[in-house]
Amino acid sequence: MPKNVTVIGAGLAGSEATWQLAKRGIHVDLYEMRPQKETPAHETGEFAELVCTNSMRSNQLSNAVGLLKEEMRHLDSLIMKAADKTQVPAGGALAVDRDSFSKYVTDTLRGLDNVTVHEEEITEIPEDGITIIATGPLTSDALAEQIQKFSGTDSLHFFDAAAPIVAADSIDMNIVYKKSRYDRGEAAYLNCPMNKEQYENFTRELIKAETAQLHGFEKNDVFEGCMPIEVMAARGAKTMLFGPLKPVGLEDPHTGETPYAVVQLRQDNAAASMYNIVGFQTHLKYGEQKRVFSMIPGLENARFVRYGKMHRNTYMASPDVLTASYEAKKRPGLFFAGQMTGVEGYVESAGSGLVAGVNAAREALGEEPIAFPKDTALGSMANYVTTTSAKHFPPMNASLHFYLLGK
């Protein structure tokens, strides 16, 4: 008779781990503190809520995260099932209707006979039994303190941010145009063209804009892949032109020319009634977001459905704590998964949950845990978070560099 497994946290990693356990016949007690206790970033009590972008990045197999997605599809990933079923147009990327995505994951797990959902906060690490802790970078203070004591190391952190979302019917379609970069795939993005003067005025006001106060925030304490747009602008007058405002491959059909800069909008829901401003993660005050982002051509009268915001993400010094199966070195049967382990990104978090779920299931069935091969996307990611120097351990997206190191 297989043992029961406790999963703490129903984010991307915890949801994926629960699915991998349940499909192997294991009974799971799944604990999620939302909606009874909220976090600074979540807005619902749904499982696998996407708190930042609605994009899961590239779908191309030549890209590390595209390869990771495909491995997960072959391993019957719930998160990939949900993403594929709820995707919205995004060119060569995989973007989803965030509400439909979370609902699919929630309904699937709540519908399983061998999953019992508990809407309550866990404040201590269970002393016995097989457990997966996947409470994410916004782990409650009480449990975060217990995890820090268990790991015996100081927790690490970085700051993450979300981009604003605007209502589609408030976008000036006489100015913006629909196109994907280099015309790859379908025309999936709305593009707001800027001339040099507009770009320079926008940059100047963006740098001057007032930011919200966030305890402990430092400009050098952000994840490079999710940098606030105002921090990027302050790095140099043309920095944004090589980032989210890059105009190459986005010729304006109205003029036949490539604009000086382009702000892209990506569909955020299946009804195409909302669009997020791509790459515009921010911690400007809400009034300043309205003032400055309304300078973008086509968004002069934009109605903001959600303003951007920033939050602190905490993670462990995993190389000192975990094995490549995401199991604690000093306590067999205790696993960790998700961004709290040092992986960064939606797909990476879910991937770590998949590996932890598979190994917790093996433990419950009396089998030995396994380390995925280092020359796979899943295995190379686990190898990174468990063998890198703990003193120099930044959070990391899937990377072909780590994949190739395993070959």
From Swiss-Prot:
Its EC number is 2.1.1.74. GO terms for cellular component: cytosol. One of its GO terms (biological process) is tRNA methylation. FAD binds at G9, A10, G11, L12, A13, G14. It is found in: Cytoplasm. It is an enzyme of class 2 (transferase). It catalyses: uridine(54) in tRNA + (6R)-5,10-methylene-5,6,7,8-tetrahydrofolate + NADH + H(+) = 5-methyluridine(54) in tRNA + (6S)-5,6,7,8-tetrahydrofolate + NAD(+); uridine(54) in tRNA + (6R)-5,10-methylene-5,6,7,8-tetrahydrofolate + NADPH + H(+) = 5-methyluridine(54) in tRNA + (6S)-5,6,7,8-tetrahydrofolate + NADP(+). The keyword Aminoacyl-tRNA synthetase does not apply. Signal peptide: none annotated. Belongs to the MnmG family. TrmFO subfamily. Catalyzes the folate-dependent formation of 5-methyl-uridine at position 54 (M-5-U54) in all tRNAs. NCBIfam families: gid_trmFO, PRK05335.1. This is Methylenetetrahydrofolate--tRNA-(uracil-5-)-methyltransferase TrmFO. It comes from Lactobacillus helveticus (strain DPC 4571).
